Amino acid sequence: MRVGIVLGTEPISPLEFWIGVEEGQVVQLDDVLYVESLVGSQRVKYYGIVNEVHKFLEGAEFVYDAHLVSKGVIPVNVAYVAKVNMTRIEPEVFAPPSPGDAVYRARGKEFEKALYYDQMKEKIPAGVDRNGNVVYVNYNFINGVEGAHVSISGMSGIATKTSYALFLLYSILEKAGDRDRVHGIIFNVKGKDLLWLDKKNKTLDEESRRVYEAMGLRAEPFRNVKFYVQPSNHDPHTPDCERLDRNVSPFYWSIREFAEEGLIRFMFTEGEEGVSNIHYVIDRVANKLYALAQNSPPGRLLDEFSRDIESLSDLENRLEEAIRDKEQNKSSELYRSWFGDAQTQTAYAFFRRFSRACMHVGRLIRESSSPPRWEENRLSVVDISGLHSIGKMFVVGSILKKVFREKENIGKPYPKVFVVLDELNKYAPKEGWSPIKDVVLDIAERGRSLGVILIGAQQTASEVEKRVVANSALKVLGRMDSSEVLGKEYEYLTGNFRQRAIMLKKGTMILYQPDIPNPMIVRFPKPAWATRYSEVEEEVHVPEDFGNF
């Protein structure tokens, strides 16, 4: 459909030009247009996205003239113009189109060419644009073939970061060619909202259903989901949540696993970076526990006196015993075996922090083991919402470390694991230290080749370790704070996108991917899965022998 012509009143370049919109046509921001022009003897097509739209009066000189025009006193024309930024030129002849060339709205194959969809070997639905056209992302830039990782930023409660992360993961699990060899791990950090992802959302509206249909996705909940929740204080075999069925299991680690896998390192939160001696003691104790585990019978953890260590409380007693032995005997070998050459005050500083952490992690360490097993289901949801920040650090670090180690041992990208982690600025902060920062960095820098893909979300990308953000091929932005969006982390926001980022509504995101030189505005539908118990659609079960009546 023709919408206007290339204007000759403004300079025309191969990278941008202005168009005059024809009467009766509507052109808005983000519309995808194209021009076919004769350059020499060659037909060249210029594809682009509208990034500015203006209307003004031609022939009017004074501000008050607008009032006179509205009354019909002064005859003037209303100019309707738009600026188009190029996304693609076919063939690549970098000469400008000519004034007066017709401008058309890109649809069908022309729309796909404008956004390079025709060159994407595998594409995944990522939402729709303002005109209802499906917006795709190049899956090879997510799954590790050409790039990996997704970074989602935006204000808390308004930017719908988690909602978009879930939608993107759902699209991957439904449409990716390798979906049968893909697993997802979601860390639920706020409330119990994600414990119903396998249930239909009774509040899903018809408009959202149409958007799902347009993208070729089923408006259905996630399938083959396992939920892992911290154990109850009263019964370690009962999850601490209101949902109790066979799809929900408590998770915890054995004290033997705790020792073998060095999980004690994840009990020490941010704020220890200024106490270098603490890290020395942490490493000494971790190495001591590993040595004890190697010399203990299977399934047990014995100390140097062949006494069982069955809980963190037992371990706490052994550490205190070693410190007290040092106070009575300056050349204590027991103390040295646990704390090395550390001063007693450093050992006490470690012990105080360890004792505090035990209060928040204690119920997760038991004699037996029941850790999350991501490989058994397509999607695993690990609920850490009820844990203290120390407990959250411990669980996230322990799981990610094990996943990464298992993938290293496999040495192949399949099966691939997509990890959805919110509040990334807490786990991989730009400044300071966190116990799992190195693990997240390993995933960001080496996860691509191992098939461990991070879908990270944070309020402010400026507070996340820059190597994590830089290694994310796909960048998504929800509504942002006006000061944050000026940071260099958002340099991909060209034109007026920084200004638009502070005005985005819920369900609308800015999407940037390597294939397309310009960012794009996308809308995504409301979740087809319940995000809280009140949204769960009741299931009606009909007995098999009902038809016999």
Positions of predicted regions on the chain:
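Phosphate-binding and hydrolysis-coupling loops of NTP-dependent motor/remodeling domains
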Residues: V32, S37, A79-A102, R498-F549
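Conserved beta-strand position immediately N-terminal to the Walker
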Residues: V150-S151, V382, I455
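Basic- and hydrophobic-enriched, low-structure N-terminal and domain-boundary segments
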Residues: M1-M155, L168-S171, K175-R181, P413-P415, ...
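Conserved ATP-driven motor cores of ASCE-family P-loop NTPases powering translocation/secretion/packaging/pilus
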Residues: D442-A528
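P-loop NTPase motor domains
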Residues: V182, I186-F187, G191-L197, E220-P221, ...
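Conserved P-loop NTPase catalytic core
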Residues: R209-L244, A470-E491, I502-K505
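Glycine-rich phosphate-binding loop of nucleotide-binding enzymes
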Residues: A126-K226, K437, K466, L511, ...
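Substrate-engagement module of ASCE P-loop NTPases
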Residues: S171-K175, Y212-R218, K402-E408, V439-I455
